[in-house]
C-alpha cells in the first residue's frame, strides 16, 4: 500500500505470500501470486479509476500478472525462499522499466520509505529495499516452520546490509542556502481551463507576495505558468522577471507552453535581478498524460469509445542534463513524474546537482494516493543521492526533505502556504 505508516504489512505480506505459494506447482503459484498482487495493487491504484476505469482494470491486472509470472518461474521446494526473493526483485525491476519506460507506482520500495530500512537505499537504490523486504519476509516464514538455516542466512544478510548502509558515503555539505517553496493552493481533482490557468498563476503570485523574510531561492511548482505560444511573448513573462527582481532572490518557475505542433514542460532559472539564466525541459514525460504510446493504435480505439478528445497532444522531450545553473550553485531538477525514477536523480547528481528540486502538479488526481507516493519517492531519491530535496506542488503535497530522507516540513492538501528552510548544498556520491 502507499506509505501511510503501514510498512510492516509489506514484510508480513511477503511472509504470507511465501506460505501461500508453498506446495504448489507453477500454475498454482501463478494464480495465487497474481491474486495476492490484485489485492495489493487494486486499492493502492484506485486513484486511476477516476481518470480511466478501463485503464485501471488493465493496469492492475497486467502488473499483478508480472508478479504471478515471477512466482511461477521461481523454483519450488527447498529453493523457494531464494527463488521468491529473486522473483520479487525481478518483477519490481520489470515494472520500473517496462512498459512505457516503467510505471513505478504502488511499489514495495515506496511502502518502505517510512521504515527503518530506508538507509539501505543508498547502497543500490530502491531495489535494495525490495530485496531486503523479500529476505525479511521469507525469513519470517521460515521462522514459523523453524527452518533455522534460512532464518540465520536472512538475518545475516539484513545485518550486513544495514552495516554497509551505515558506513557508506552519504555526500558532503559544501554550503547552505535559504529557500522558500510556494504552494498557491486550490481545489484538487480539477481539469485544465484557460480561466483556471489564470487563477493558478494569480494564486502563486499571491502566495509569493506573502514571503516575509530574505531568501536566496524561491521554488514554484510544475506548470503553474500555463500559456499558449512562447512564454517570452506572454504578459506573464515580464511580470515574473519583475517578481524575482522585487524578491531579490532566484525564482524557479514551472512553465507549460502549448505550442502549435507540440507542448513543452520546463523550469527556468530567473535571477534576483530579473534575468533568465537557464532552462531545463522535462525529459521523462508521462505516458497517456504528456504523450500517447502507439498513438496509431490508441486513437482509433479512443474514437470508438468516445474519449478521443481526452488524448493529449504529444509533449516535446528534453535532451539536456537534469540540472539548472543558479547563482547559488547547480540544482538537480526532476519535474513531477521524473522523481519516481532513480536514474533521473543520478543524472542530476552526475551533472553536478547539489540540491534536488521536484516541481510537480498533482491537482488533477482523485484522493491523495499519488501525492503520498510522490513524497515517499522523494525520500528515496534524497537518500540514494545524499541530497536535500525540495518538492513544490500547487495544491499539495509540498515538502522539505533532508539527505537522510526525513520530511522536515510538509504542506496540507489545498492550502496556500510557503515552506521556508535552510538547506545544504552537497556533493559526492552514496
PLM-predicted stretches and their roles:
Residues 169-429:
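Soluble catalytic domains of enzymes that build or remodel membrane lipids, polysaccharides, and related
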Residues 1-167, 367, 378-381, 393-395, ...:
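Membrane-embedded alpha-helical bundles of multi-pass enzymes
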Amino acid at each position: 500500500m502507499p506509505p501511510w505508516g503501514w510498512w510492516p504489512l509489506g514484510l508480513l505480506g511477503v511472509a504470507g505470500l511465501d506460505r501461500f505459494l508453498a506446495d504448489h506447482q507453477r500454475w498454482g503459484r501463478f494464480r495465487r501470486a497474481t491474486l495476492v498482487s490484485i489485492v495489493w495493487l487494486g486499492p493502492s491504484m484506485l486513484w486511476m479509476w477516476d481518470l480511466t476505469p478501463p485503464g485501471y482494470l488493465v493496469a492492475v491486472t497486467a502488473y499483478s500478472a508480472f508478479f504471478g509470472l515471477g512466482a511461477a518461474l521461481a523454483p519450488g521446494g527447498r529453493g523457494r525462499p531464494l527463488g521468491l526473493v529473486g522473483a520479487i526483485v525481478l518483477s519490481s525491476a520489470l515494472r520500473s522499466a517496462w512498459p512505457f519506460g516503467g510505471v513505478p507506482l504502488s511499489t514495495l520500495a515506496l511502502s518502505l520509505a517510512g521504515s527503518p530500512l530506508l538507509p539501505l537505499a543508498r547502497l543500490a537504490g530502491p531495489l535494495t529495499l525490495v530485496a531486503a523486504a523479500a529476505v525479511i519476509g521469507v525469513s519470517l516464514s521460515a521462522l514459523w516452520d523453524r527452518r533455522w538455516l534460512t532464518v540465520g542466512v536472512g538475518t545475516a544478510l539484513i545485518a550486513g546490509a544495514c552495516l554497509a548502509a551505515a558506513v557508506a558515503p552519504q555526500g558532503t555539505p559544501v554550503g547552505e542556502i535559504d529557500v522558500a517553496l510556494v504552494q498557491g493552493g486550490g481545489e484538487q481533482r480539477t481539469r485544465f481551463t484557460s480561466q483556471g490557468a489564470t487563477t493558478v498563476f494569480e494564486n502563486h503570485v499571491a502566495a509569493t507576495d506573502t514571503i516575509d523574510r530574505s531568501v536566496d531561492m524561491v521554488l514554484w511548482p510544475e506548470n503553474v505558468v500555463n500559456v499558449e505560444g512562447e512564454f517570452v511573448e506572454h504578459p506573464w513573462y515580464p511580470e515574473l522577471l519583475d517578481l524575482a527582481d522585487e524578491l531579490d532572490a532566484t525564482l524557479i518557475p514551472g512553465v507549460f507552453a502549448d505550442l502549435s505542433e507540440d507542448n513543452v514542460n520546463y523550469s527556468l532559472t530567473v535571477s534576483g535581478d530579473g534575468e533568465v539564466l537557464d532552462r531545463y525541459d522535462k525529459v521523462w514525460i508521462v505516458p497517456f498524460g504528456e504523450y500517447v504510446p502507439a498513438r496509431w493504435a490508441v486513437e482509433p480505439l479512443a474514437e470508438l469509445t468516445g474519449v478521443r478528445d481526452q488524448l493529449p497532444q504529444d509533449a516535446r522531450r528534453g535532451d539536456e542534463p537534469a540540472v539548472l545553473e543558479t547563482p547559488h550553485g547547480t540544482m538537480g531538477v526532476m519535474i513531477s513524474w521524473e522523481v519516481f525514477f532513480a536514474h533521473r536523480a543520478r543524472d542530476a547528481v552526475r551533472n553536478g546537482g547539489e540540491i534536488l528540486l521536484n516541481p510537480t502538479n498533482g491537482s488533477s488526481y482523485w484522493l491523495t494516493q499519488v501525492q503520498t507516493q510522490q513524497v515517499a519517492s522523494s525520500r528515496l531519491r534524497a537518500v540514494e543521492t545524499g541530497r536535500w530535496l525540495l518538492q513544490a506542488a500547487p495544491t499539495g503535497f509540498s515538502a522539505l526533505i533532508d539527505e537522510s530522507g526525513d520530511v522536515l516540513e510538509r504542506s496540507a492538501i489545498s492550502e496556500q502556504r510557503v515552506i521556508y528552510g535552510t538547506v545544504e548544498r552537497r556533493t559526492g556520491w552514496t
